Structures are given as structure tokens and as C-alpha cells.
């Protein structure tokens, strides 16, 4: 009777699968980041370069990729502010903000449109970069990027993982 010999390739297969996953995560997160940058508005928030601060990070141990932006303004860009906030949970009414003073005060005052514009004009006359607003509409650059790339990224994952496993 012929002798059957079993060769355990599970370690090599697991390593190849892990390498394929890591390569794919870098590719997918890089593409998602690039599309998010393209979807972002050019310097909407004065000194904040939201567009130029989108980055991705791959945790090779967890086989996870994260796309994000360290700027608080990226949150505003994604979800909107004030009366235009995506979940309708923003401030209501007009307020004045000074560029560079990003953290809202707990005693934030609200005004009529006319009052807010007059106060902003006065502050600008004092050399401050002041603006009257009732909010900013959400742009959703990350959400739009994910939505537009989801099917492509799934197909690409199948290609990359399938090619490495042959």
C-alpha cells in the first residue's frame, strides 16, 4: 500500500494571508484617504488645513486600518455645525467666533443675524478675524469616500487575498 505523507503548511499559509491582509489594508486605507482629501473643501476654516491632514494608520497586529484627521475642524467638516449639523443637534441661532479661538466658551452668546454681523464687524475693526455664523453645512468627505469606494475595495480585497492564496 502506498504511503501518504502529510505536510503541514498552515504556518506558511497563515503568514501569506497576514502579509496579503497588511498589503491590502495599506492599499485600501491609502485610497480611502486620497478620496477623502479630494472630497474635502479647501481651507474652509481659516487657518485649519483639514484637507492636508487626513492620514491613515495600519495596526498590523490587529489587522485594522484607521483613517482620520487630528483637527477638530475635520469633525465640523464631516458633521456640520449649528443649524446645519447633520443630526440637527447643533447650536440654534447666530453667534460670533474668532478664528484661532477654536474651543467654544460655556457662556456662548447667541444673537440676531444683524447683531452678530455688527459684532463681527467691530471685532474685525479691532484686528481680529471674526465671523458671524449660524453654522456650516456638513460636507461628509470621509463618509462620501467610503460610500463611493466600498464596492471597489471589497472587490480589491477579494483579488489581493485570492492572488496570494494561489
Residue ranges and their predicted role:
Residues 1-74, 78-166:
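Short, Lys/Arg-rich flexible segments
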Amino acid at each position: 500500500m502506498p504511503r501518504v505523507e502529510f505536510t503541514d503548511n498552515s504556518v506558511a499559509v497563515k503568514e501569506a494571508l497576514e502579509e496579503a491582509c497588511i498589503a491590502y489594508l495599506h492599499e485600501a486605507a491609502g485610497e480611502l484617504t486620497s478620496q477623502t482629501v479630494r472630497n474635502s473643501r479647501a481651507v474652509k476654516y481659516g487657518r485649519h488645513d483639514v484637507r492636508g491632514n487626513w492620514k491613515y494608520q495600519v495596526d498590523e497586529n490587529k489587522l485594522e486600518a484607521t483613517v482620520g484627521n487630528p483637527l477638530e475642524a475635520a469633525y465640523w467638516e464631516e458633521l456640520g455645525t449649528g443649524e446645519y449639523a447633520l443630526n440637527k443637534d447643533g447650536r440654534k441661532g447666530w453667534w460670533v467666533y474668532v478664528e484661532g479661538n477654536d474651543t467654544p466658551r460655556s457662556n456662548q452668546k447667541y444673537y440676531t443675524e444683524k447683531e452678530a454681523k455688527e459684532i463681527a464687524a467691530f471685532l474685525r475693526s479691532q484686528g481680529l478675524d471674526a465671523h458671524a455664523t449660524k453654522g456650516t453645512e456638513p460636507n461628509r468627505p470621509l463618509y462620501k469616500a467610503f460610500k463611493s469606494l466600498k464596492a471597489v475595495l471589497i472587490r480589491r480585497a477579494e483579488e489581493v487575498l485570492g492572488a496570494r492564496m494561489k
